[in-house]
Swiss-Prot record:
Proteolytic cleavage leads to an important conformation change. This reduces the affinity for steroids. The lineage of its organism: Eukaryota, Metazoa, Chordata, Craniata, Vertebrata. The gene is Serpina6. Gene3D superfamilies: Alpha-1-antitrypsin, domain 1, Antithrombin, subunit I, domain 2. It comes from Mus musculus (Mouse). This is Corticosteroid-binding globulin. One of its GO terms (biological process) is glucocorticoid metabolic process.
Length: 397
């Protein structure tokens, strides 16, 4: 199965929802030439993780993972074959153009949107006296702003503390913990991390947030802070796929699809997720007057990508089939890649609570939609159509 590294970036090349953004001459650069042969990489990966954790919260950032994998192609002697296996047509695009595209994309995502608080990056930790070649270090720094830090200690506890402290500093304290009980035979540990929090275009008022029941399953109920909003909100009820949803925009380029499967239909809805489904939903959204209840929560997850990428067709990086001879000076390179994602969903209001006015009056005759059972949260950047976050929320408490 041919998989594309670049997740959802070029969905705007299709009709409807994906063609809302104008393209300037400056923007028509190499990052737009990253059009994948299979833009369903994000959903393939998400579905695999959900299958492995069907009764648990699942959270990943496909675009962040994509950048990490593209960066690692710089380390392999057979990089052309590696990139072709990931879905790139190397007869139409050079390796340099691919990396230049990711370089520009990274700049767009991290600098052009004031409505998203996002910290995203890659950092390589070198163990067991591993020394990387200057050319590889220069390329990863230039294209991906990646750092390489040496861990001199063979004490795994101290090594884990160094990794955690570095990521905590890079995310301004948002991500405090990445690894625990670190015991790895790897000589290079790549940490791919992202923190995301958005400001809603139509914010919730903290004055209206209240404690409500959330039904985790048939036997388990938890109390969660439930945000409340009343107004015209983009809504769609799917007659073909058993779910209903709202689309809510962040200030700036961010947008979200918050999907509520019918009772017991989570697996059916997850199986139906793909580019065409999201495109169809976007076209069919209509404003509806409603009382909307969504849990306020903070979620984080950590994955060893070796465990999941092999299941979606990418495994050679973690085996002796990858030739890293052009990357290291002496010590053989063995690789571990960890993905850490954190999502914060709150009222998203830039104003102090005291200035938000009195609690909203919820009209009794309005339609009420409560996300009080497991749901799906998808966040995209509308300008690049990058898949920022994908989450299955089984228990927001």
């Amino acid at each position: 199965m041919s998989l594309a590294l670049y997740t959802c970036l070029f969905w705007l090349c299709t009709s409807g929802l994906w063609t809302t953004q104008a393209v300037t001459d400056e923007d028509s650069s190499s990052h737009r030439d990253l059009a994948p042969t299979n833009v369903d990489f994000a959903f393939n990966l998400y579905k695999r993780l959900v299958a492995l954790n069907s009764d648990k919260n699942t959270l990943i950032s496909p675009v962040s993972i994509s950048m990490a994998l593209a960066m690692l192609s710089l380390s392999t002697r057979g990089s052309t074959q590696y990139l072709e296996n990931l879905g790139f047509n190397m007869s139409k695009m050079s390796e340099a153009e691919i990396h230049q595209g990711f370089q520009y994309l990274n700049s767009l995502l991290q600098q052009s949107d004031t409505g998203l608080e996002m910290n995203m990056g890659n950092v390589m930790f070198l163990l067991q006296n591993l020394k990387l070649k200057d050319s590889f270090l220069a390329d990863t720094k230039h294209y991906y702003e990646s750092e390489a830090l040496t861990i001199p200690s063979k004490d795994w506890t101290k090594a884990g503390e160094q990794i955690n402290n570095h990521v905590k500093n890079k995310t301004q304290g948002k991500i405090e913990h990445v690894v625990s009980d670190l015991d790895s035979s790897a000589t290079l540990i790549l940490i791919n991390y992202i923190f995301l929090k958005g400001i809603w275009k139509l914010p919730f008022s903290p004055e209206n947030t209240r404690e409500e029941d959330f039904y985790v399953n048939e036997t388990s109920t938890v109390k969660v802070p439930m945000m409340v909003q009343s107004g015209n909100i983009s809504y769609f009820r799917d007659s073909a796929i058993p779910c209903q949803m709202v689309q809510m925009n962040y200030v700036g380029n961010g947008t979200t699809f918050i999907i509520l499967p019918d009772q017991g239909q989570m697996d059916t809805v997850v199986a139906a997720l793909n580019r065409d489904t999201i495109d169809r939903w976007g076209k069919l959204m209509i404003p509806r007057q409603m009382n909307l209840y969504i849990p306020k929560f903070s979620m984080s997850d950590t994955y060893d990508l070796q465990d999941v990428l092999a299941d979606v067709g990418i495994k050679d990086l973690f085996t002796n089939q990858s030739d890293f001879a052009d990357t290291t000076k002496d010590t053989p390179l063995t690789l571990t890649v960890l993905h850490k994602a954190m999502l914060q969903l709150d009222e998203g209001n830039v104003l102090p609570a005291a200035t938000n006015g009195p609690p909203v009056h919820l009209p009794s005759e309005s339609f009420t939609l409560k996300y009080n059972r497991p749901f799906i949260f998808l966040a995209f950047d509308k300008y690049t159509w990058s898949s920022l976050m994908m989450s299955q929320v089984m228990n927001p408490a």
